[in-house]
Amino acid sequence: MADDWESAADSEIILQNAASTVNKWEGEDDDDDVKESWEDEEEKKDEENEKPTITDVPVKTKPSKALKAKLEEQARLEEEKEAKRLASLTPEEKLAEKLRLQKIQEDSDLNHALDTFGVTRAETNGNGLDSFNPETKEQFKEFGSALSWKVGQYRESAEFPQFVEDLVRGLCIHLSAADIKKVKMSVEILHSEKLKMEKAIAKKAAGKNKGKATLRTESDDIDDYKKYGNDFSEDYDDFM
């Protein structure tokens, strides 16, 4: 009986050792599984962090076809209205309109030039032009607009034409013959346009005066006779 107990105890002990060994290995496997799952989660987090964040972009709503068609129709009507207005203008009125638009463009160029160089209109009345330091072609163009505006303020003076002539001559001294020729051609084109404008204005004024009726009196007829040597006073003296 004792032998049976001893053998049973030995076998039980062996079983417990085997079980503990198996459990130990199983525990080690569980640790490995936990480690691998933890590494997988870390990799997933890294991948999620590496993904670029997508920000919501506001979607621009396109105008409806009906609204777009209405706007295009309004623009077309405005263009037709402006075309009719220009067509009804006389030649001198068209030229005046051209000069008006040119003046608006010059003012716009001047404002742009002043903004570019950080100069105000008030400064151009003093020494503000010294603030300009043009280097590029566009900057020289803007500087020229500002300078023309400044000089043009004295156009009503009787000395202005001679001043411009002297100014152009003084500036052209620094140019080559080829460049002076370009300036000459530009001035000739301007002269031709001005001549057409002045003729159109004079023609319009003559047309208005031509339609006026004149009243002749008896004294006017007598004056005409006197021009040809017929003096009624002499005839009257002879008669007496």
From Swiss-Prot:
Tell me which Gene Ontology terms the entry assigns under biological process: formation of cytoplasmic translation initiation complex; regulation of translational initiation
Q: Does Protein transport appear among the keywords?
A: no
Enumerate the subcellular locations listed in this protein's record, separating them with semicolons: Cytoplasm
The reply on keyword Iron is no
Its quaternary structure? Answer: Component of the eukaryotic translation initiation factor 3 (eIF-3) complex. The eIF-3 complex interacts with pix.
Name of this chain's protein: Eukaryotic translation initiation factor 3 subunit J
Domain of life, source organism: Eukaryota
Where are the annotated segments for Disordered? 1-66
Bias type Acidic residues, positions: 27-45
**Gene encoding this chain?**
eIF3j
Task: List keywords of the entry alphabetically.
Answer: Cytoplasm, Initiation factor, Protein biosynthesis
Role of this protein? Component of the eukaryotic translation initiation factor 3 (eIF-3) complex, which is involved in protein synthesis of a specialized repertoire of mRNAs and, together with other initiation factors, stimulates binding of mRNA and methionyl-tRNAi to the 40S ribosome. The eIF-3 complex specifically targets and initiates translation of a subset of mRNAs involved in cell proliferation.
Which family does the similarity line name? Belongs to the eIF-3 subunit J family.
Family annotation (InterPro entries)? eIF3-like_dom_sf, eIF3j
List, alphabetically, the Pfam families matched: eIF3_subunit
Where this protein primarily resides, as one coarse class?
Answer: cytoplasm
Q: Which GO terms describe its molecular function?
A: translation initiation factor activity
Mind telling me which GO cellular component terms the entry cites? eukaryotic 43S preinitiation complex; eukaryotic 48S preinitiation complex; eukaryotic translation initiation factor 3 complex
